[in-house]
C-alpha cells in the first residue's frame, strides 16, 4: 500500500457502511498509513522535495474540491462513478505498466516544471478526492512520463502528493462528521504496518519491487470491478 495506496482493498472492509461514510473512514485510514510511508521516503532522500511540495499544493486543492463534490453526490451516483472510472483506471495502468527506470531530470526547477508539478498534483488530487484507487500508481506514471524521474524518486514524490490529498479529503470529511473511528482505527493500524513494510521494500528493491506492484494494482482494480458487477 505504500506504493499504490490501499483505497480499493480497505473500502471492501467497510461493507455495510453507506458510501459517504466508507469514503471518509477509508480516507482516515489511508492518511495514517501514507504519513509513515512519506516519512520513510523523506528519511532516505528518495524524493525531489521541491517538486513534491509543489505537487502537494496542487493535490491538496484538488482533493479538497473532489471531496466536496463527493459530498454533493448521491450514493447511487457515487457507485455509478466508480463503475465507470475503475475500468478506465485499469486500462491506463496496463498501458503504462512498463515505465523506464532512468532519471532524466536535470535537477533544476524552472517555471515550466513548477507548473507541471502543480498540474499533476491538482489532477491526481481531484481524482483521489473523488475516487481513490490507484492514485499512487497514477502519480508515479505522471512523474516518470511527464517529468523524467526514475521510479524510486517518482514514488517518493507521489508519497508527498498523496499525503496532501489524503489530509485535504480527510479534513473535509471530519468537518462533516463522516469518519467512523471504531472501524477506521483498526484499519489505520493495518495500513500503517503495510505502508512501513511496503516502503522498506520499495526503497531497497526499487524498480524490481515497484513494477510488479503496479501489476498487482491492475489485478486489484479489475477484481474490484468484477465483484462490483456481480
Spans of features found by a protein language model:
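Transmembrane alpha-helix interface/packing and boundary motifs in multi-pass membrane proteins
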Residues: 5-6, 122-131, 169
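Extracytoplasmic gate region of multi-pass secondary transporters
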Residues: 135-137
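Single conserved hydrophobic/aromatic residue that forms the stacking wall/gate
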Residues: 1-5, 9-10
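Transmembrane helix-loop junction
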Residues: 13-14, 21, 67, 71, ...
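Transmembrane helix exit motif
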Residues: 36-46, 83-109, 222-230
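Membrane-interface alpha-helices at helix entry/exit sites of multi-pass transporters
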Residues: 17-26, 50-54, 148-159
